[in-house]
């Protein structure tokens, strides 16, 4: 089994547990160049989203694939979710290690007011 397949299997296990809880989830995806975050309802409707591919976020950054960029994405997605009335979510790290950009995004979202 290769690295990507292992990550996707971990992600499926976590998503199944979150689905059983029936709560909104904060989904994180990262690539070498960008970081993406979405708040998704139990009915699989995207309630809020932010990424380093957006012009509004990219204008604040020098580089898009680092920890500082992930912090901006976390803060932005949390603010947008709170505007929509979502304050409590489950954190879905998509099988990525809770380290570096993923952890930075989570910490920034917590500081901006999301609870998980």
Swiss-Prot record:
BP-aspect Gene Ontology terms: translation
InterPro entries in the record: Ribosomal_uL18_bac-type (IPR004389), Ribosomal_uL18_bac/euk (IPR005484)
Pfam family, one: Ribosomal_L18p
UniProt keywords, alphabetically: Ribonucleoprotein, Ribosomal protein, RNA-binding, rRNA-binding
Keyword Transmembrane helix included in the entry's annotation: no
Any single Gene Ontology cellular-component annotation: cytosolic large ribosomal subunit
GO-annotated molecular function: 5S rRNA binding; structural constituent of ribosome
Keyword ATP-binding applies: no
Family: Belongs to the universal ribosomal protein uL18 family.
HAMAP family documented for this protein: Ribosomal_uL18_B
Subunit structure comment from the entry: Part of the 50S ribosomal subunit; part of the 5S rRNA/L5/L18/L25 subcomplex. Contacts the 5S and 23S rRNAs.
Function: This is one of the proteins that bind and probably mediate the attachment of the 5S RNA into the large ribosomal subunit, where it forms part of the central protuberance.
Protein name: Large ribosomal subunit protein uL18
